[in-house]
């Protein structure tokens, strides 16, 4: 059985090495070790050193071959949220974030959450327009996410005041 042992972020892996795709919803894109079936019906073992969140367009590297399995975000029930102006959009984002709800920022400033009737009612009360449909969901990683080890550094500067 093929064994995928590492994750490569979208845009950082050689696309000519793609041998398969695997379509997974948001919940299934946070794994460490599990048997999966690619979109062509072939099984493989995901065997990562630690639980890792992978996104749409990332690749799972197959051990000992250099082959890549591209991850596709499955269409799932989502709610796209738009606001009449930027101040309202910031307020909506704050309210959604205050509920520790995964949220995707869309091009153009819209917001996407997994469809949840309670949250949809809340943002509508706050003046948002909501479009419910099925689409891939790739929320922001969050402020405390390590970014997959892609060169994230903390910097400390000391300021001397005399």
Regions found by a protein language model. Give the residues of each.
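A common structural junction motif
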Residues: 64, 98-100, 127-132
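General beta-strand structural signal in soluble alpha/beta enzymes
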Residues: 71, 105, 113, 130-133
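Compact, glycine-rich, soluble single-domain proteins
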Residues: 29-95, 112
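Intrinsically disordered, low-complexity, positively charged segments
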Residues: 1-51
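Glycine- and charge-enriched low-complexity intrinsically disordered segments
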Residues: 85-124
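Anionic-ligand-binding alpha/beta catalytic cores of soluble enzymes and soluble regulatory domains
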Residues: 1-15, 22, 122-124, 129-156
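Conserved small/polar residues in nucleotide/adenosyl-binding loops
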Residues: 159-162
């Amino acid at each position: 059985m093929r064994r995928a042992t590492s994750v490569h972020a979208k845009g950082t892996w050689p696309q000519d090495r793609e041998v398969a795709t695997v379509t997974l919803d948001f919940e299934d894109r946070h794994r460490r070790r599990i048997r999966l079936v690619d979109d062509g019906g072939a099984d493989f073992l995901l065997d990562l050193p630690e639980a890792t969140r992978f996104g749409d367009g990332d690749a799972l590297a197959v051990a000992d071959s250099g082959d890549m399995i591209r991850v596709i975000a499955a269409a799932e029930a989502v709610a796209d949220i738009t606001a009449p102006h930027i101040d309202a959009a910031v307020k909506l984002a704050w309210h959604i974030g205050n509920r520790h709800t995964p949220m995707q920022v869309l091009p153009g400033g819209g917001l996407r959450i997994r469809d949840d009737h309670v949250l949809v009612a809340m943002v509508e009360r706050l003046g948002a327009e909501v479009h419910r449909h099925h689409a891939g969901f790739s929320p922001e990683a969050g402020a405390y996410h390590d970014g997959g080890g892609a060169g994230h550094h903390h910097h400390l500067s000391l300021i001397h005041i005399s």
